[in-house]
Amino acid sequence: RSYIERHGLRWSVVESLPVTETIKYGGPDRDEQIEIYKQSMRNLAAEGIHTICYNFMPVLDWARTDLMHPNADGTSNLYFSFAHFAYFDIHILKREGAVEDWRKFKIEGVERDILAEVETIRQTMTQEQEQQLIENIVIKTQGFVSGNFKEGEKHPVELFRRLLALYKDIDTDKLRENMKYFLSAIMPVCDECDI
C-alpha cells in the first residue's frame, strides 16, 4: 500500500479475492471457508478497500494462453487464444466431451471452426510450446490467482483434472445455487463494511 501511495495512487480495489473450490462446488468445509472469506473482507474494509472482485468459475480464474504476446511495436502483452485453449482442453487435458463442446463453439453468436484451428496448432506445436501452454494456463495464471497450483508442480495437468473432477456432478443450476448460498452468506458483511 505504501509503495502505491508513494507513487501518487490509492489502493481501492482488490481483484480478485479468491473463492475456494470447496465454496464453489459446495464441499463439506464450505461454511468454514466462507467464514475465512468474510474475515478477509473485513480485513480489507478495515484498510479502506471497499471494492472486492471475485470469480465463481470452476477451477479456472482468468486464463491466458500467452503471457508475452508480441506486438508490432516491440512491446508485449497478455493474450488469450480460444484455439490454443481448445488445444489444451482437447489434446492436453483430454477432457471428456471437449471435442463436441468445441465443435459447437460460437463467439458472440458467430460459429467458428475452432477444431480446424486446433488441428493446425496440433501439426506445428512443439513439446516446448506445449509445456509453455501448460505453464501459462495452469501454473502461471491459476497459481497466481487461486493458489491451487505452485511453481515447480510436477504434474499440473493431473492436478487440474482432479480439481475439475470435483465438479463432475455440478451442473449450471447447482453452481448457481452454490453461488447464491455464498452471496447470501457474505452480503451481511458487505452491508456491515460498506463493500
Residue ranges and their predicted role:
Residues E5-S12:
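Asp-box/BNR beta-propeller blade signature and adjacent active/binding-site loops
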Residues S12-E15, C53-N55:
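A cross-family glycoside hydrolase active-site/sugar-binding cleft signature
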Residues I23-I195:
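Active-site acidic/histidine proton-transfer and metal-coordination neighborhood
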Residues T20:
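Nucleotide/phosphate-binding sheet-loop regions of phosphoryl- and nucleotidyl-transfer enzymes
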